[in-house]
UniProtKB/Swiss-Prot annotation:
Classification via Pfam families: FKBP_C, Trigger_C, Trigger_N
UniProt-recorded name of the protein: Trigger factor
Organism field: Alcanivorax borkumensis (strain ATCC 700651 / DSM 11573 / NCIMB 13689 / SK2)
Function statement: Involved in protein export. Acts as a chaperone by maintaining the newly synthesized protein in an open conformation. Functions as a peptidyl-prolyl cis-trans isomerase.
Catalysed transformations (reactions): [protein]-peptidylproline (omega=180) = [protein]-peptidylproline (omega=0)
Entry keyword set: Cell cycle, Cell division, Chaperone, Cytoplasm, Isomerase, Rotamase
Protein's gene: tig
InterPro entries noted in UniProt: PPIase_dom_sf, PPIase_FKBP_dom, Trig_fac, Trigger_fac_C, Trigger_fac_C_sf, Trigger_fac_ribosome-bd_bac, Trigger_fac_ribosome-bd_sf, Trigger_fact/SurA_dom_sf
Length: 437
């Protein structure tokens, strides 16, 4: 089999492959003979259609089918022979395709880039140092009370913390604008759900009252038409509800798995969960910074096919997350929406794979086992969860992948500049974007 390789641009390769005529013609003849046994045509007995007629009617389609198989098989042999690593599916084009003549075809595809790993000592990582204090536990218990608050109608002016049911209509230069009108909307005052000034304007209103409030949209508002614009909202309050917080009693604690109503046990359980959250948050922040450092350190061409695949995966994930099981038009989620993140993901994946290969890193079996047990402890029957994970290759592979990433992070941190920074619990558990903001 004759093979020639041409680099057309960047990662794109053009491979020309020659296949002996006999290999194609024999395969075509064999398929036609098989087809002859089952073809039914008017005027002929089943299985007795002359080969001449079979070739006339079906020869072209059968040859195309054979060509697809032959080109695919020959391509696999060619890339193995030339030690190429295709990224994505190739495009095939037969340049010589006649019975009795050698087949020649061209396969165009991208290859994986050669990733030259840089030193990690320029990567900077800020590692939060924090602990869960008694005050943090008390604050969390108050948050849990807020989450389980109940609202009831009150006959008084609204206050911060109340929930109001309102109708509103926004006007800009006397004209209604898109998204500025709603009826029967519930709003907790002080939640920051609406633009600045909106909720404050409702404080002090009673059920049945109406008034206009003047507000200005923030300069960074998502709508170009409304950024920095002064508008008037006509507000009608339909209902005012006061918030009633539950007592921290036996019934309340039972909802968190403390059946005997022991407050000491309850606080210990809350602290345990907070410490787990703190540990995970610190690990996540350190990992994200290390991964960002790897991405920023390595610049190389990315296979477009891999980026396209990642964009499709991200789009599908978003459709499943927000589609609510409904039919979703993918056109409202253009490629540009995902491209930057997709490129980062592909680049990071290639760098991580290069690190794993260079350092011959395999998933640490003890760490995998510990992670499986940690996950299982969150369920009622841990033993069944452990058994299920180890009998489910896809689930186990996900856990092994997470452990491999952690092992890569550990390797990076051995060389990176790591600065420990003491901070309160609330700051430590905030996502990086919020903490930086």
């Amino acid at each position: 089999m004759q093979v020639s390789v041409e680099t057309t641009s960047g990662l794109e390769r053009r491979v020309t492959v020659g296949v002996p005529a006999e290999k194609v013609d024999v395969a075509v003849e064999g398929k036609l003979q098989e087809a002859q046994k089952t073809i039914r045509l008017d005027g002929f007995r089943p299985g007795k259609v002359p080969m001449r007629e079979v070739k006339r009617r079906f020869g072209g389609a059968v040859r195309n089918e054979v060509l697809a198989d032959v080109m695919r098989e020959a391509f696999i042999e060619a890339v193995e022979q030339e030690k190429l690593q295709p990224a994505g599916m190739p495009g095939f084009e037969a340049t010589t395709n006649e019975a009795g003549k050698d087949l020649e075809f061209v396969a165009t595809f991208e290859v994986y880039p050669q990733v030259e790993l840089a030193a990690f000592d320029s990567i900077e990582v800020e590692k939060p140092q924090s602990e869960v204090t008694d005050a943090d536990v008390d604050t969390m218990i108050e948050t849990l009370r807020q989450q389980r608050a109940e609202f009831a109608d009150v006959d008084r002016a609204s206050e911060i913390g109340d929930r109001v049911n309102i109708d509103f209509k926004g006007l800009k230069d006397g004209e209604a604008f898109e998204g500025g009108t709603a009826e029967g909307q519930n709003l907790e005052l002080g939640s920051g759900q609406m633009i600045p000034g909106f909720e404050d304007g409702i404080v002090g209103m009673k059920a049945g009252e109406e008034k206009d409030i003047d507000v200005t949209f923030p300069e960074d508002y998502q709508s170009e038409d409304l950024k920095g614009q002064a508008v008037v909202f006509h507000i009608k309050v339909n209902k005012v509800e006061g918030k009633a917080l539950p007592e921290v009693d036996a019934e309340f604690m039972k909802g968190f798995g403390v059946d005997d109503g022991d407050e000491t046990k309850f606080k210990a359980e809350v602290r345990k969960n907070m410490e787990r959250e703190l540990k995970n948050a610190i690990t996540s922040k350190v990992k994200e910074q290390a991964m960002d450092g790897l991405v920023n350190l390595h610049e190389f061409d990315l296979p477009g096919a891999l980026v396209t695949q990642e964009i499709q995966r991200m789009r599908q994930q978003m459709m499943q997350q927000f589609g609510g099981g409904q039919q979703f038009d993918p056109s409202i989620l253009p490629d540009d929406l995902f491209k930057e993140q997709a490129e980062r993901s592909v680049r990071l994946g290639l760098v991580v794979r290069a690190i794993l290969d260079k350092n011959e890193i395999k998933a640490d079996a003890d760490k995998v086992k510990a992670r499986v047990e940690e996950i299982s402890e969150q369920y009622e029957k841990p033993e069944e969860v452990v058994s299920w994970v180890y009998s489910n290759p896809q689930q186990l592979q996900q856990i092994e992948g997470a452990i491999l990433e952690e092992q890569v992070v550990d390797l990076v941190l051995e060389s990176a500049k790591v600065e420990e920074k003491t901070m309160p619990y609330q700051d430590a558990v905030k996502p990086r974007e919020q903490a930086d903001g």
